[in-house]
């Protein structure tokens, strides 16, 4: 008899069949059951809802992985429940209209930290470690927790983790400027910005008129 689960989003009955299962994590022992009916999220992002996660033999509600006894920022370890949580959060980022950076999944070239508060996953940030300088790839705060300074907390943790120059792979330039202003990495000065922390701009960030509005380096 085929096991079935109800999709919590569209209400469809989803059968546990090979065509509905993917293994996108570091071990094939962790399986993801997807609803076969695509949905359209924010900014027309097409996605499939995560119905269940099979974690080492047991099918679990995805929400279970976003609950933990941890507190604060913790690095994600491959093959653990935190890796599943990271996968779920990235899927949520896409569903909510956020950009997914190519190659920012967990690997030997990418590390990530999840922020936990009151036993709940608040969000995460990831960084590339194989680039010229440490580069923040993605940062995400879940909608229900925004406005509490959590993005600032994660930016500050990233900066404090590296003594030398860093870079930020931000699609939304205004968002990047605002966050760096909040943590004191840059400050407004005259017609542009003064760098208080050594930050390298990526190739597509180089145009000062588009990005920094006539930046001034200290």
Task: State what each model feature region is.
Residues 1-133, 160-218:
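Terminal substrate-recognition subdomain of acyl/acetyltransferases
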Residues 141, 146-160:
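Conserved acetyl-CoA-binding loop-helix of GNAT-fold acetyltransferases
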């Amino acid at each position: 008899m085929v096991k079935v689960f109800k999709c919590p989003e569209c209400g469809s009955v989803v059968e546990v069949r090979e065509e509905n299962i993917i293994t996108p994590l570091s071990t094939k022992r962790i399986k993801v059951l997807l609803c076969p009916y695509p949905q359209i999220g924010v900014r027309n992002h097409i996605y499939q809802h995560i119905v269940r996660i099979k974690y080492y033999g047991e099918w679990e509600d995805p929400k279970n992985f976003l609950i933990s006894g941890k507190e604060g920022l913790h690095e994600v370890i491959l093959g653990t429940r935190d890796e599943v949580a990271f996968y779920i959060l990235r899927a949520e980022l896409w569903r909510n209209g956020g950009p997914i950076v190519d190659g920012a999944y967990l690997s030997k070239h990418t590390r990530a930290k999840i922020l936990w508060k009151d036993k709940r996953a608040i969000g995460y940030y990831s960084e590339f470690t194989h680039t010229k300088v440490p580069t923040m790839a993605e940062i995400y705060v879940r909608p229900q927790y925004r406005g509490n300074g959590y993005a600032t907390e994660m930016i500050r943790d990233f900066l404090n983790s590296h003594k030398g120059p860093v870079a930020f792979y931000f699609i939304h330039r205004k968002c990047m400027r605002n966050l760096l202003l909040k943590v004191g990495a840059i400050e407004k000065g005259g017609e542009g910005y003064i760098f208080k922390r050594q930050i390298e701009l990526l190739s597509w960030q180089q145009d000062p008129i588009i990005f920094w509005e006539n930046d001034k380096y200290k």
